[in-house]
Amino acid sequence: GDLPVPRTRKDLLDPRYRDRIVLFGKDRTEISNATFLYIYKEFGMDGIRSLARNVKHALHGAQMSRMAGSANTEGGAVYLVSWFFAKTCVKPNVEIVWPEDGCMTLPMYLLVRKDRLEAVRDIVDYFVGVEFAAACSRAFFPAANAAGGGLLPPGAKLAWLGWDYLRSPD
């Protein structure tokens, strides 16, 4: 249609997208908080309210991948989905957009008890190593070791909330 393609997080707040955005979540009512953290940091509560008006509902990434570009009335015009699920949506009328202000990232944690580190050293080394990073990259998932990656689109940026922000009491 005549709806412009959003290129930044700020674009998602525009009233023209009212009830047209589908976010990643467990189901139609349980939405991942990741997007809201970024919107709140950049645009405050006004940004949260604007985004909330524009969100139709949430779907799992696999559902979004199947629904995007279809005539299904449960779908939306814009889907915020992980790169993996975006890459599985190969349809001529769907455009995958890497945000100009960077793709939102969230850290994954590998927690190991200090007294057990040596017992599981091989496993830890594998998960932070080049081989696992390369496998993640081939599956369009970020990895802990940049040396094994390299499959991001040219000029792709990543957005990161920052530890200081996440640790702040607000």
How should each PLM-predicted stretch be described?
Residues 1-23:
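A conserved helix-loop-strand patch within extracytoplasmic ligand-binding domains
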Residues 20-24, 30-101:
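Ligand-binding pocket segment of bilobal, Venus flytrap-like solute-binding proteins
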Residues 1, 105-119, 135-139, 144:
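A bilobed periplasmic-binding-protein/Venus flytrap-type ligand-binding module shared by bacterial periplasmic
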Residues 2-7, 40-47, 115-120:
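Short helix-loop capping/hinge motifs at secondary-structure junctions, enriched
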Residues 10-13, 36, 40, 120-128, ...:
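Non-transmembrane alpha-helical segments in soluble domains
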Residues 44-47, 129, 162:
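Glycine-centered helix-coil hinge/cap
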Residues 20-26, 127-151:
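Periplasmic-binding protein-like
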Residues 151-170:
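Extracellular/periplasmic bilobal clamshell ligand-binding domains
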